[in-house]
Amino acid sequence: MLYDAIIMSVKVISVVDDMFFASKIRAVAEAVGKEMSFPRSLEAVVSKARETKPGLIVVDLHNQRIDPVVLARELKSNEDLRDIRLLGFFSHVQTDLKTSALSAGFDEVIPRSVFARDLQEILTAD
C-alpha cells in the first residue's frame, strides 16, 4: 500500500473539496507535523506541486472542482512531477472511479472509509 512507502517530505497536497474531510485532514496533519496545502484548481495544484515538491498528493476522486483523471495525467506526464505519489480515495460503491484513477496514473486508490480510518498512518508512513 502507498502508506507503506517512504514519504520523506513533510509537505502534502490535499485535493479535497469536502469541508468535513478537509477539516479532518488538516487536524491530523497538524497533529503529526505535516505541512498541508489545499489548492482549489488544477493550475493551483500543479503550481503548488512544482513549488513545494510534496511527498504525497491525496485526492478525493469525487472532487467537483478538479477532474482527478486530468490531474493525474498532468502530473505523471511532467518529468519534474511524475514521482510525486498520488493517493486517491472514493466511495467504495463507485469502482469505476477506482479503475479510471489507476489507469490515469494514481499510485493507489482506496475506499473513503479506509482513508478516514488510516489517515494518521498515511500521513506518517516512513
Language-model region placement:
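Conserved acidic segment of CheY-like receiver
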Residues: 10-19
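A short, hydrophobic beta-strand element within the central beta-sheet of small alpha/beta folds
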Residues: 83-92
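Output/docking surface of receiver
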Residues: 105-117
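Short hydrophobic/Thr-rich beta-strand motif most characteristic of the beta2 strand and flanking loop
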Residues: 33-40
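Conserved phosphotransfer cores of two-component systems
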Residues: 76-81
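Acidic, metal-coordinating helix/loop segments flanking the phosphotransfer/catalytic sites
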Residues: 41-56
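Alpha4 helix (beta4-alpha4-beta5 surface) of REC/receiver domains from two-component response regulators
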Residues: 93-108
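Conserved phosphotransfer microenvironments
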Residues: 59-75
